[in-house]
From Swiss-Prot:
One of its GO terms (molecular function) is glycosyltransferase activity. InterPro entries: Glyco_trans_1 (IPR001296). The keyword Cell inner membrane applies. One of its GO terms (cellular component) is plasma membrane. The gene is wbbK. Keywords: Cell inner membrane, Cell membrane, Lipopolysaccharide biosynthesis, Membrane, Transferase. May be a glycosyltransferase involved in the transfer of UDP-GalF and UDP-glucose. This is Putative glycosyltransferase WbbK. Gene3D superfamilies: Glycogen Phosphorylase B (3.40.50.2000). Its main location: membrane. It is a peripheral membrane protein. It is found in: Cell inner membrane. GO terms for biological process: lipopolysaccharide biosynthetic process. Pfam families: Glycos_transf_1.
Amino acid sequence: MGKSIVVVSAVNFTTGGPFTILKKFLAATNNKENVSFIALVHSAKELKESYPWVKFIEFPEVKGSWLKRLHFEYVVCKKLSKELNATHWICLHDITANVVTKKRYVYCHNPAPFYKGILFREILMEPSFFLFKMLYGLIYKINIKKNTAVFVQQFWMKEKFIKKYSINNIIVSRPEIKLSDKSQLTDDDSQFKNNPSELTIFYPAVPRVFKNYELIISAARKLKEQSNIKFLLTISGTENAYAKYIISLAEGLDNVHFLGYLDKEKIDHCYNISDIVCFPSRLETWGLPLSEAKERGKWVLASDFPFTRETLGSYEKKAFFDSNNDDMLVKLIIDFKKGNLKKDISDANFIYRNENVLVGFDELVNFITEEH
């Protein structure tokens, strides 16, 4: 059997979580016998030194527009797959490329097509999200049945894909969450928690319309008379129209602290000094703060959706609320403060106990490179 040539397409990943996904995937490709890896990226500047066994090909212009992106996926990639003699092709960013290879895979992580009840206000504040919702369902569909396997992060998305696209070769590939080395309180944390009796509630999220910051502001307003409860939110109001709107909703609230963007060390500090991680988001592929809160043993108050229940699984220090009901959230916070919040032993993953699941990028890369 000849050497396999695996092409990893990630031209759209440049920053944040998606770029982290690319780096974790590349790290998992090391020491694979009879396999060479080629990565198609926006820029290889930050990657070459860390992953010397990978050949990088740069496409800096592709991210410039959707037309360039689609031309790349459906025209350039076909030509490239022939020139590289690729045997395997994995698209890490949702679109199934038009290629000529023995094996073809796509990693689908954008849940926008499945967002329900988008409001006109949300469309005005983040029109790009509305376009994603409308177009991504169609983009997912193109070539999807030509894949050897389709990877998603959760079973709820697998069920959506089965229903919408009539395919059965969907593999759940979950991220492996590991705590950073800094997991203990430091002196720097004192700037946030001067009063040990204070109840601190943390919500780390970028300002997107589906993140549902409004619910936290509404709950904070109803709790404003209780001086020993405060909320830490990771927006500043300067990021976009939605962030500015949230700041305006919180006018006059002393119990809400807008911290802006935080680096990983400061995020860790906020987790450490928080009593509750609140997660009112209406849409996620996974919900990283849920996993990070679990790893730290924090109480989690989360919106009641399949993705939150699946991510939290059998974790007992959890409680759920309707994402449109601030009174439910307020009650949970008060119950916690009084010591009346009961642990939840339910496990949404129990029904999937007999399903095959890939955990972490090592297992994902092994699945791709092994014969099936």
